[in-house]
């Protein structure tokens, strides 16, 4: 029976090296299950022959996945996949004692202290490395060595800190720490007692870490004393003397690889060391000696080197070690040797841990030279939860190189909480704080940090991809699994992720002042400041208006004298977002990813911070509220969207109509001019053709004028497609409005044939000028009409959005009211569980729940869904017993099914919550007491397998008779949920052999896969189908069953071909 929720949602793997360890393994497993662990597997190493098995990451994930393994429990590291587990997947490996002590203390203890790795000499140490003494390159190297030795790096000093690493007695941190007190602070006004620190910190030189690393054993005696700070060491000569002892110590050099036998790790590899690794000289000697002791070669580079000559002199250089990704040395190196391996110091120690040379492309993000900082510490102050062991170090390093700070506790000073699941107090508190508009904290997952760094740009942490807190469902989503081999992933522009800081677009040179002025003028037609594209409908309207005004502008150029005062052309649309030139320049500037040199001192229980640090609003990113409201209303209101589509259609029709009328008007004017020529010709020749033509043209104009009733139909009048003064782009602009000519268009547009006399008598220039002048005069009215149309259109759209917004506000207020009621009811409990159940109900709760109870369940992590949808990722079923309903049968296909519970769980839970008893510490409801009888752990565990029940039985295609009770749709959906790929419905009365589909037997090795599988309801159907198949394919295997056979297989999640129950006919290979 479960006694606590200590290991809730956590998965464990217990490794047993010898049979004698089995009792302790089962005892540990029982302890884990009693404290609510999600899953615990026992793997007997002594029964497995893994010598010929490639135990790589894929093997481990397939063997023990797909869900994340949070902890591996083993008293030894002598198993073949230790390095994959600990260094690659970043899964802590702890002894059995960790479980026992964690249960005793009721908290997850630090995993380093319980590591079975003998090289973790500093497992009991919490070390602060002074940022005043060391530059960023040295800080990275020392922290990497500390992590490799199992120590814990802290960026604050507390009473748990054991060591402080400094370079000299003059380090300012020494004076700061010596003044620290814990408990009550001295105060003359309150006369509070001042307590002394709970421990004496040891101040040590960095050689303390180097000696541990080189000797691979604890320091004792004179060596330990040598590493401790001596306040008398005031001269550089004295400090150098200590370094020379550790660098030149032959004993330590020879024992460096005691526990790491691969002494030829860097054989055939030549390392070029970049000058941007600004090391203290003795530290460079140490690094050089480290590489050479592992059979590698080293060539230092300098900024004055002719790199081409260096690489020609040493053609075997194949590795580059540097600090900054923006170094000019690195840029030149890549151009000369594009195939070179480019890494940083962390990469060297990572390979040392793996005992294998590994290209940077197969390592972690943090193993390449670092990008410039993206954030400031005010923008990125991170707390984290639900990460263990090396995962915390990885987050700390990512945050550091992004420019931020990480803190152990969650306070109002934090800007972000990083988590991969929804359990824990930090998550609940952060979610509450996230609702505070003045000082909201953003809850996001670790993929946000990784993607920001990998893409070298600030991404929106509220993007749906970074709001996925179910990352434990897939081991491939573990932190640190995005490596440099993913560097070709899409950039933020085409990621469906919204870039929320425009200064990240810094690849292009910053715009000039003139360009910035133009950009600022065009702000009203750019995409939104948050990067979201403007809707296609707005674009289509703007494009149409642009086209009209472009035509008008071209006419205005031709007739500048007439239009100078009456028309101002619309500014052209910018094709890039607004970028602050100052921000752009700052972004482009190389900051070399400096790690903040601030020294933070945390006093537990009494954190010394100024009040303003807690109350100052933290600005994450600003999107215009008006645009946000419109975006929300578009997403939430299908009615508005349909109205917009109707308006768009009307606009297109308007464009088509105006285009036709342009053509009509244009040709009428031409024919009128031609007609005047004919009149003059008639007067000279006395012919009647001109009079007839005139009569026809007048009648055509009358018809056109009657049709011209639309308010905006005159917009294109007077603007001829063939006007010589319009440039060649004109037809392309108007091509969108071109419509096929109707018979009427053709009639009205027939040109009068011209004769030789017509060519002699050209129309007067006055008539041409008259037409153009009229067109120019109408431009005022045209633009006013357009503006009026825009206003009307926007007014309609805003009105509909306001209606939708009022509905949203009402709904939001109702939700807040329900949430408040639920919180008030739950307030009498000190602790609230997060059950993380997404469930459907069958055979119970027919009347549903009231709104307050639904909100209460939601706040406890229980969500009830009406129907089963694959996208909802359901993991629970509520039913009074095992049922044959569609929902129950499908629930056994959930990936995974975590619980099959009786409805009494909900009833008792709500009963306890609504009881009038005194305030309770926690809700005393045990999930395991409500499990449905018959759905045991063995069945639950099978839902975590990567394949479904019928898929495992090699049944992928099945034939189903059309008269099956329940209906073919329902039965078919259940079968598909459990692995059937193709379902063929047979009409038993009119069925032929060709109607029966065979099963997929392509993977058949030694027989055993039935070629024909059928589900029938009558004995007569069996006789008919067996005859059809045996007559045409008599040598093939057949399986004919009742529906009950499928149901039994689903209930057990196993197909038993040896059982004859519900099998009507079976034919196997001889």
Curated annotation (Swiss-Prot):
Q: What is this protein called?
A: Regulator of Ty1 transposition protein 107
**Which residues does the UniProt record annotate as the domain BRCT?**
2-103, 117-213, 260-352, 369-453, 829-910, 934-1049
Which InterPro entries does the protein's record reference? BRCT_dom, BRCT_dom_sf, CellCycle_DNARepair_Reg, RTT107_BRCT_6
Q: Which residues carry this modification: Phosphoserine?
A: 304, 591, 593, 720, 800, 806
Q: Entry's PROSITE patterns? A: BRCT
Q: Which residues form the signal peptide?
A: none
Annotated Gene Ontology cellular components are: cell periphery; Cul8-RING ubiquitin ligase complex; nucleus
This chain is encoded by the gene named: RTT107
Which domain of life, per UniProt?
Answer: Eukaryota
Major localisation: nucleus
What residue spans carry the Polar residues bias annotation?
735-753
Q: PANTHER family given for it?
A: REGULATOR OF TY1 TRANSPOSITION PROTEIN 107 (PTHR47667:SF1)
